[in-house]
């Protein structure tokens, strides 16, 4: 059963009256500027924002206007498949504005989310690989929820290909890509149970979150890879990858050598990106429960 915490928003069936989305040139700007970044890029911290509520385990982050939407999982008993999926609306100062709960039975683990200009797309899966998921659309204004489809695998993140009218998901650990064609006049997949499927040939990081770049068939994914020398401590190295959603392959990869004071990679959890006047701005939310948004810029 889907639980809602805001007002009396009813669970809607995926509808057919979908407003057209205006393409935004920012997407191509982000993609082109990202491809100019290298391992020598200098990252400048410009702001920290402490979230004023318990965030649990953050999963996905999307910027809608001046608001952040954050998906998160609250685990009660992982072995028994019990927990709660959350979607939080947060203002620019880190204050909680509204929240809803998403999930059905053992499917309580939200993944990385994306905003297509009209809807937020949120996958909620069982907390284990090779399991199953349910995909929701959420209206960011009303927080009304539409259950779109179920899928027989763990979907760790979803991104929107606005240029190609496609939805792309990744499996647990992002080892597989799934791609669905959306119907011309509806924000629903043409064949929910039969997507294009291919292995992810990039093994640099496991994606935690992703963001489709408007006006393009690119998406930016962020994640971590855990490395350790024999007998030495484990280090989580964060990285960002630009993925061509038409070819389902990474076209540019950049390490992000940034950590919190406690040694966590800034890409441990979700990330969001924006274009600035001359560069790019990245917002990272790596910590659980008592989270701080770390904002960095590059040029």
Predicted regions and their residues:
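Repeated scaffold domains used in trafficking and secretory/extracellular systems
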Residues: 55-60, 105-112, 153-161, 202-212, ...
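Structural motif
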Residues: 79-86, 130-136, 175-181, 228-242, ...
């Amino acid at each position: 059963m889907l639980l809602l915490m805001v007002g009396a928003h009813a669970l809607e069936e995926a509808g057919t009256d979908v407003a057209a989305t205006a393409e935004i040139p920012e997407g191509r700007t982000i993609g082109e500027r990202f491809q100019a970044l290298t391992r020598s890029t200098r990252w400048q911290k410009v702001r920290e924002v402490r979230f004023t509520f318990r965030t649990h385990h953050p999963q996905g982050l999307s910027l809608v206007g001046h608001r952040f939407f954050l998906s998160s999982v609250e685990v009660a008993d992982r072995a028994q498949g019990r927990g709660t999926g959350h979607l939080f609306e947060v203002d620019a100062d880190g204050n909680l504005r509204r929240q809803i709960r998403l999930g059905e039975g053992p499917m309580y683990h939200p993944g990385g989310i994306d905003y297509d200009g009209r809807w937020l797309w949120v996958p909620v899966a069982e907390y284990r690989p090779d399991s199953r998921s349910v995909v929701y659309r959420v209206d960011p204004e009303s927080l009304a929820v539409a259950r779109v489809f179920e899928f027989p695998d763990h979907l760790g993140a979803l991104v929107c290909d606005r240029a190609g009218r496609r939805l792309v998901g990744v499996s647990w650990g992002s080892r597989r890509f799934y791609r669905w064609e959306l119907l011309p006049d509806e924000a629903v997949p043409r064949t929910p149970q039969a997507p294009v499927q291919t292995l992810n040939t990039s093994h640099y990081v496991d994606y935690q979150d992703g963001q489709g770049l408007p006006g393009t068939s690119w998406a930016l994914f962020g994640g971590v890879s855990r490395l350790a020398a024999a007998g030495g401590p484990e280090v989580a190295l964060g990285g960002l990858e630009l993925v061509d959603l038409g070819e389902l392959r990474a076209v540019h990869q950049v390490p992000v050598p940034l950590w919190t004071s406690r040694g966590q990679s800034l890409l441990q959890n979700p990330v969001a990106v924006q274009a600035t006047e001359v560069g790019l701005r990245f917002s990272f939310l790596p910590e659980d429960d008592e989270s701080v948004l770390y904002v960095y810029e590059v040029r």
